[in-house]
Amino acid sequence: MLEARLSQTLLLKKIVDALKEIIAQGTLDCSENGLELQSMDNSHVSLVALSLASDCFEKFHCDRNVSLGLDLKSLGKVLKCANSDDAVTIKAVDRPEKITLSFESDGKERTADYELKLLNLDQDHMEIPKKDYTCFIQLPSSEFARICRDMSMFDESLTIACSSKGIRFLAKGDLGTANIQLSAGTAMDVSIEVQEPVTQSFAGRYLNTFTKATPLADRVKLYLSDERPLLVEYPIEDYGHIRYYLAPKVNDPDF
């Protein structure tokens, strides 16, 4: 049986909002250690991975591993029925066909219970190779969201180039060229670690969708290496993260 309680529904709303634009459905794997979800988008270009430790919850009990097939858009609709400061408790029995979400207002003056049917999803759990990246960038998540938004006005592709001089974002299109460069420093709160220079191009619409996770974290981490997917990580305080993996485009433009 699973029982997990959060003191505020807001966190769960933010997580679902960060997932549902990439994947419509996903399997939430529950264990005594917490919750995990991993799934690819329909185009098999991007992979999203959620990890949330049991310590994140006000109360957490899972006496047997259980997998919950979720329709994320439907879950998002149920969460809209709750105020952001309501407490939420998620319950599921062994071999469940549904989950129960119970919302309580502060002071328990209002309670509401909703049942959500589960899906029978046949999803393979992909093993992500644990290899070191040659470039690591950390910057404010709001700045990354702004860059992705601004670049999308110029072209559907966004080129990221990382070197010892800093990190550059470039988009070229019919409208013209957009070129933004960031250097490591305290004023912009940007940190950059480079072992080898990397230049890769990515589909801008995916990067823009990744920034739906901005409300979850003040800072975002970018990891790049040649011939490897880009890793965009949003830490969820000290309790976990959402990670997005995005395959680079085959032909990078001259930079």
From Swiss-Prot:
Keyword Cytoplasm found: yes
CDD domains: PCNA
HAMAP family to which the protein is assigned, alphabetical: DNApol_clamp_arch
One of the GO BP terms on file: response to hydrogen peroxide
Subunit relationships: Homotrimer. Interacts with the catalytic subunits of two DNA polymerase complexes: PolD1 in the delta complex and PolE1/DNApol-epsilon255 in the epsilon complex.
InterPro entries: DNA_clamp_sf (IPR046938), Pr_cel_nuc_antig (IPR000730), Pr_cel_nuc_antig_C (IPR022649), Pr_cel_nuc_antig_CS (IPR022659), Pr_cel_nuc_antig_N (IPR022648)
Alphabetic keyword roster: Chromosome, Cytoplasm, DNA replication, DNA-binding, Nucleus
Keyword hit for Repeat: no
Function: Likely to be an auxiliary protein of DNA polymerase delta complex and is probably involved in the control of DNA replication and repair by increasing the polymerase's processibility. May function independently of PCNA during DNA repair.
Protein family: Belongs to the PCNA family.
Localisation per UniProt entry: Nucleus; Chromosome; Cytoplasm
Protein name per Swiss-Prot or TrEMBL: Proliferating cell nuclear antigen 2
Molecular function GO terms recorded: chromatin binding; DNA binding; DNA polymerase binding; DNA polymerase processivity factor activity
Residues of the DNA-binding region: 61-80
GO CC entries: chromosome; cytoplasm; nucleus; PCNA complex
